[in-house]
Amino acid sequence: KSDGMPTYHFANVVDDHDMKITSVVRGEEWLSSLPSHVTLYNHFGWSPPKFYHLPLILKSTGQGKLSKRDAEEQGHPVFAVQWEESKGFKESGYTPEGILNYLALLGWKGKGDDEKYSLNELVKKFDSKDINKSGARFDIKKAVWINHLHLRDFSSKKILSLCDQANVLLGKKI
């Protein structure tokens, strides 16, 4: 930039190189920056990491990119935790296992009919060749259902622990 500060792209490439990043996973809206990043890597004589561009997460209608505003309009979270006025998934009662599972299925489909995955299963089964080419529609009913699949397998002790955490998070005492 004219003020002497490194631009985003320059800083991004240098930071990823210094941190020895081998794979970059980001949204398709960054696809247009790929040539600039590869050019910078080549200019410095560095091997670029592997780049994976995920499809956009679309509104529940399938039209347009999901945004923060959609949380207020449609009454469901779009962030992991509270962000300003909108409740996040955590405050809405989603488990880390359930929301991770649901988000992993947005834009990716493993082999077979399975829809419930643990983190370890996702790591084992993930193949970048299975990333969808088109945008993924955000379906809050499916997110609730997948979260339910995880909740029903939890022990009573874990359910009580989650309830305690929710009460603390919501500022309630029981």
Predicted regions and their residues:
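Catalytic adenosine-cofactor/nucleotide-binding cores of aminoacyl-tRNA synthetases and other
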Residues: 32, 43-174
